[in-house]
Regions:
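Transmembrane alpha-helices and adjacent helix-loop boundaries
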Residues: 1-394
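Generic N-terminal initiation segments characterized by hydrophobic and/or small/turn-forming residues
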Residues: 1-3, 61, 162, 168, ...
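Short linear motifs at secondary-structure transitions and domain/linker junctions
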Residues: 17, 21, 28-30, 38-40, ...
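Residue-level detector of alpha-helix boundaries and kinks
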Residues: 32, 50, 139, 268, ...
Length: 677
């Protein structure tokens, strides 16, 4: 009986969660709204947040500070790590604890005022994030999650067993902030609520600056495909470390607020379950979505407290008794269970969250899991609000050219060097556990050439590219770019040295637009720092404008300028290949490595690709090409090298290679012996 009664409740609830179309349409309209409309809406929302608490009783004012306000601050910080950079952190409560304990020690032991301890609490938490991230961020997925979980428990256990930190007794007598503008900070919740609100507003301002900059694009690229991001010049380790540091600093801010308000902390305030709650807020709201995370944190903090309220509990009790025919007397003791059950239902029927980011919605749609969204992506990623919305026409080439002072669309960002030899491999050998993938390979590529590398599958062609780009470090030998050795450099450093590549299997950032993909490439040539992005320095704003203009030019150059606002995953296969080439060119290379660019193309697409490759070469860019299509190779290459079983068996002009008996036997195929019996 109870089972069938619950079905009566949850069937309509499931339909509601699947069809949150007004929320999704509103998110799309918000993404396309002009700046002044967004400003008015945010101003009205801020006024609402300021005025409404004045009408509430003290209990609900206290709830708005903790848990709601603290949860929102912490969820915004964790969203940087989990939602934007794609790093799973299960020990986030540690940074909250570090901020709280720093405040407690400075105000009780060293006599600091609460305001004076604020920057130190944030800084120490940030340092803790760096100390955790530096040795662990080369781990990925579950391994990183396990390490962060352990860190969270270590911080709590250290606090519990350290006498100077109060051990299990905790620390009492933490100072409240001194009065400002006549406002006293004692135990009354309202001043602390407004303090938390101010922290949220300032944090949102800084966060939006980051997400609309190179930093935000780098985080999005890392989440989409970390290896491809590194190949496009993104310093992935540094950017992940910045994400950890920013998230930790936000957690430290939350710890300062909490300790300053309650005046007493102990290790029991920072259990592992608290990290789970904040992570649940991020997932519930929509990973990567700032408004979604705020909504999720509000729900996580407010609803259990609402269920605790006697009047609300009586209402829900009456509803449950009516539906199930049971006799529930005290609903408050089941509030966590009911809320947990509601979260499970939410995650089943709307896994993208309340207000999902565009990336999250697209990922779930691609996996066939997204039952709650229309085909059109819901919201534009905050990192590129200025980019065309998906499916919308891009800015015209003429308008962009005018913005860039009339620079020519055909100009490529080619790195100009005096050296005649662009790329040189000197006796490169690559072994994997005794298996020789490359054996003493030497190749010299002259400036302005289209140099082809051919050979049967397994000959070592892609391994050679991986050695050049820093994915693998050769067992022996050397790799020189423009006369300088790049051996041992990380892939993004080799990109900076002038090497760009495409991949055998297309590796775009599928849930970013075509324009955003190429802008990630242009970022490799810009030097804007994270502090510069936070402060919105003139250089940063100029580079942002120039990067978008140049990205649109390159899309026009490869023939897909009209698709700039489309998600990369929605482009036809041939256009995806062109986009990958445009993104690689955007890094400003002196040599472009193309790994089987014609694979999967039809004859007309291949013919267009031949024209594009020649056009790129004529613009001054050297090309090294791996390809199995002999018609394409013989038609565009100036010189060829042939690999077989990891060794170079021939090198020379295409005609000589075509007639080389050893190449014919190993790869091209010998003519059939008609005289055989």
């Amino acid at each position: 009986m109870i089972f069938f009664s619950l079905r009566r409740v949850f069937r309509p609830l499931a339909r509601l969660l699947r069809r949150l179309a007004p929320v999704d349409r509103g998110a799309r309209l918000w993404a396309r709204a002009p700046w002044w409309e967004k400003g008015l809406a945010m101003g009205a929302l801020l006024a609402f947040a300021i005025v409404v608490p004045l009408t509430l009783p003290t209990y609900w004012q206290s709830v708005l500070f903790f848990p709601v306000g603290i949860y929102i601050i912490l969820a915004l910080g964790l969203n940087i790590v989990v939602g934007m950079a794609g790093l799973l952190d299960l020990g986030y409560v540690a940074f909250y604890a570090v901020g709280a304990y720093t405040t407690a020690k400075l105000t009780t032991t060293f006599g600091w005022g609460a305001w004076q301890s604020l920057p130190m609490a944030v800084f120490i938490a940030m340092v803790a994030g760096v100390l955790l991230g530096a040795p662990t961020l080369r781990l990925r997925g579950d391994y990183l999650a396990i390490v962060t979980l352990g860190f969270g428990e270590i911080v709590r256990i250290v606090a519990q067993n350290t006498d100077s930190l109060g051990a299990s007794r905790g620390i009492t007598g933490i100072r409240h902030p001194q009065a400002i503008f006549g406002t006293e900070f004692k135990f009354a919740p309202l001043p602390y609520y407004y303090l938390a609100l101010a922290a949220i507003v300032v944090g949102l301002f800084l966060l939006l600056r980051l997400t609309r900059s190179r930093v935000g694009r780098s985080w999005a690229a890392i989440r989409e495909d970390e290896d491809a991001a590194e190949a496009m010049g993104v310093p992935t380790f540094n950017m992940k470390l910045w994400a950890f540091a920013m998230g930790a600093a936000t957690g430290g801010m939350g710890g300062w607020l909490y300790a300053s308000k309650v005046g007493f902390i102990n290790p029991d305030n920072f259990p592992f379950f608290f990290s789970v709650i904040i992570l649940a807020a991020v997932v519930l709201g929509g990973m990567g979505s700032v408004p979604g995370v705020i909504a999720g944190a509000f729900a996580i903090g407010f609803i259990p407290e609402y269920l605790r309220d006697a009047a609300a509990g009586k209402t829900i009790r009456d509803v449950l008794n009516f539906v199930t025919g049971g006799d529930v007397h005290d609903i408050t003791e089941y509030r966590v269970l009911l809320f947990g059950f509601a979260l499970v239902v939410m995650m089943i029927f709307r896994p993208q969250g309340l207000i999902p980011s565009r990336q999250r919605a697209a990922e779930l749609a691609e996996a066939g899991e997204d039952r709650g969204l229309a085909a059109t992506p819901t919201t534009t990623h905050e990192a590129a609000e200025d980019a065309p919305a998906p499916g919308q026409p891009a800015p015209t080439s003429a308008a962009l050219a005018a913005e860039a002072d009339g620079a020519s669309v055909t100009e490529l960002p080619v790195e100009v060097e005096a050296a005649e030899t662009v790329l040189e491999l000197e006796k490169v050998t690559m072994e994997f556990g005794g298996v020789v993938a490359l054996n003493d390979v030497s190749i010299t590529v002259a400036r302005g050439q289209i140099f082809g590398i051919i050979g049967p599958n397994g000959a070592g062609k892609t391994t050679l590219f991986n050695c050049v780009t820093g994915v693998f470090r050769p067992t022996s030998g050397d790799v020189l770019v423009n006369g300088s050795s790049v051996l041992g450099r990380r892939p993004h450093r080799i990109t900076e040295a002038g090497v760009a590549r495409t991949f055998q299997n297309i590796r775009l950032f599928p849930n970013m637009t075509a324009l955003e993909n190429v802008v990630v490439g242009t970022d490799a040539r810009h030097g804007t720092s994270v502090p510069g992005a936070l402060l919105g320095l003139p250089r940063h704003r100029r580079e942002e404008r120039e990067g978008k203009v140049e990205a649109q030019r390159l899309l026009d150059y490869v023939g897909i300028g009209a698709r700039a606002g489309d998600l990369a995953r929605n482009l036809p296969y041939g256009d995806q290949r062109r986009l990958e080439i445009a993104r690689a060119i955007a890094t400003g290379p002196s040599v472009l490595l193309l790994d089987e660019p014609a694979a999967g193309m039809n004859p007309s697409e291949k013919q267009a690709l031949i024209g594009l490759i020649r056009q790129i070469r004529d613009s001054g860019l050297t090309i090294v090409l791996i390809e199995h299509d002999m018609g394409l190779v013989m038609g565009v290459c100036d010189r060829l090298a042939v690999l077989d079983f990891g060794g170079k068996i021939a090198e020379g002009p295409p005609q000589d290679i075509q007639n080389n008996p050893r190449v014919i036997e190993a790869y091209l195929g010998a003519p059939e012996d008609t005289g055989a019996a």
